């Protein structure tokens, strides 16, 4: 049976030492004793860090030492509900990215070009979350950048080289590793051209950024300031080749569905044409018909679209998908709040109808999965405020009436057999 020693007290004769780092029990917070050895809390934390790093890159590998698309999508499925096609495209892209790097190291006559990806989908459908989940499960440097903060060189804001700087930081400034990394650029629809006439004014945060991104996305040797750019003009620059860096761009492209629908209406003229009202079709359904010309009309320049050969559209999340998002993934919202309540020794439970009502509210707000947390916070706010002061509460039950605001959460007390509704206002 192991014992735990604190850091206070004891004379020098009976002082215990960590068998790994050699620190005494007085130099650490805790010392855990085994049959013949001791380990301190600092060494335990170090071991946990090593295990986490091992787990991060412990995916099943194919014969070439490359993570298989099936394995990548299997891990994505644990965290992200739905969007099967987008997950398939991302899994294949990452798999091919590894293979291309492996092929480049072996040499050969055929040079494998990279296929950058554009993710298009309505807000709250999981574009950014897919990228964040991908970052956790791959073992190449990965960084996320926000396109809204970028400006053309020479203007107030971030240079596009700052994206490569973030990738360098995620690779601990190892240039070789950074050159094999993956970059996700979010909110790329916000850098669309502000006007159809390019000669009206200089568009430093729109078309100017697209022009600046062209070369690093295609492949160039970028000069990256290690201290972050314009504030330190005397610093030496690091040279990073972006040829093998995979770029994934994502955006909601609000209004793109109307451009696609308008194009469809032009081609559906005549007595035999099938007329479908735009209001009868969901955004995700319309986006499936996306063509590069629609993105040009939206405000992306043709050269920028040409650097993103793979187009992946994401679906709207329906009621059933939102219910699954609430309860099924490893870090589902319901599980997160249940863990919060467990810290107060209280069980939190939701009726099935309550989850369905939450999903309906999110659909009404048109915020997708992103709106689920704000709805949950509003429902549970009063309960989380009162609970620390209440004694004997064993369980809190949320019904559909609670979600609609027609009732209070049900409090079940440990010292009573009957269920007691919370009467306080």
From Swiss-Prot:
Domain of life: Bacteria
ClpX-type ZB domain location: 6-59
Binding site for ATP: 122-129
Keyword terms of this UniProt record: ATP-binding, Chaperone, Metal-binding, Nucleotide-binding, Zinc
Gene Ontology biological-process annotations: cell division; proteolysis involved in protein catabolic process
Physiological role: ATP-dependent specificity component of the Clp protease. It directs the protease to specific substrates. Can perform chaperone functions in the absence of ClpP.
Annotated InterPro entries: AAA+_ATPase, ATP-dep_Clp_protease_ClpX, ATPase_AAA_core, Clp_ATPase_C, Clp_protease_ATP-bd_su_ClpX, ClpX_bact, P-loop_NTPase, Znf_CppX_C4
Protein name, as recorded: ATP-dependent Clp protease ATP-binding subunit ClpX
Binding-site list for Zn(2+): 18, 21, 40, 43
Pfam families: AAA_2, ClpB_D2-small, zf-C4_ClpX
A GO CC term attached to the entry: HslUV protease complex
Assembly behavior: Component of the ClpX-ClpP complex. Forms a hexameric ring that, in the presence of ATP, binds to fourteen ClpP subunits assembled into a disk-like structure with a central cavity, resembling the structure of eukaryotic proteasomes.
Family, per entry: Belongs to the ClpX chaperone family.
One Gene Ontology term of the molecular function aspect: ATP hydrolysis activity
């Amino acid at each position: 049976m192991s014992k735990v020693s604190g850091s206070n007290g004891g004379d020098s004769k009976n002082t215990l030492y960590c068998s790994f780092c050699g620190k005494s029990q007085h130099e650490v917070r805790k010392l855990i004793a085994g049959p013949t050895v001791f380990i301190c809390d600092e060494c335990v934390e170090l071991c946990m860090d090593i295990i986490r790093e091992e787990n991060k890159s412990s995916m099943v590998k194919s014969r070439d030492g490359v993570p298989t698309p099936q394995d990548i999508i299997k891990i994505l499925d644990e965290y992200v509900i739905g969007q099967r096609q987008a997950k398939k495209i991302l899994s294949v892209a990452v798999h091919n990215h590894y293979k291309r790097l492996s092929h480049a190291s072996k040499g050969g006559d055929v040079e494998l070009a990279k296929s950058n990806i554009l993710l298009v989908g309505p807000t709250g459908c999981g574009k950014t979350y897919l990228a964040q989940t991908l970052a956790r499960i791959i073992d190449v440097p990965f960084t996320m950048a926000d396109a809204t903060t970028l400006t053309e060189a020479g203007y107030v804001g971030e240079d596009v080289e700052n994206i490569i700087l973030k990738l360098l930081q995620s690779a601990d400034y190892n240039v070789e590793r950074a050159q094999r990394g993956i970059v996700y650029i979010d909110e790329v629809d916000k850098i669309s051209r502000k006007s159809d006439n390019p000669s009206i004014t200089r568009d430093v945060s729109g078309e100017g950024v697209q022009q600046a991104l062209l070369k690093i996305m295609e492949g160039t040797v970028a000069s990256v300031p290690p201290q972050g750019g314009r504030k330190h003009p005397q610093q030496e620059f690091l040279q990073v080749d972006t040829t093998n860096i995979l770029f994934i761009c994502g955006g909601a492209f609000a209004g793109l569905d109307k451009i696609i629908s308008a194009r469809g209406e032009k081609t559906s003229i005549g007595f035999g044409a099938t007329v479908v009202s735009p209001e009868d079709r969901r955004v995700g359904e319309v986006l499936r018909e996306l063509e590069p010309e629609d993105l040009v009309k939206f405000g992306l320049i043709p050269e920028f679209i040409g650097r993103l050969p793979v187009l992946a559209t994401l679906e709207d999340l329906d009621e059933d998908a939102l219910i699954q998002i609430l309860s099924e993934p490893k870090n589902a919202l319901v599980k997160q709040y249940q863990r919060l309540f467990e810290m107060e020794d209280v069980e939190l439970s939701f009726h099935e109808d309550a989850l369905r009502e939450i999903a309906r509210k999110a659909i009404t707000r048109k915020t997708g999965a992103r709106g689920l947390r704000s709805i949950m916070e509003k429902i549970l706010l009063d309960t989380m405020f009162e609970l620390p002061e209440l004694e004997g509460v064993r369980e809190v039950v949320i019904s559909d009436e609670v979600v609609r605001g027609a009732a209070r959460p049900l409090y079940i007390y440990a010292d009573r057999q009957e269920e007691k509704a919370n009467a306080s206002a």
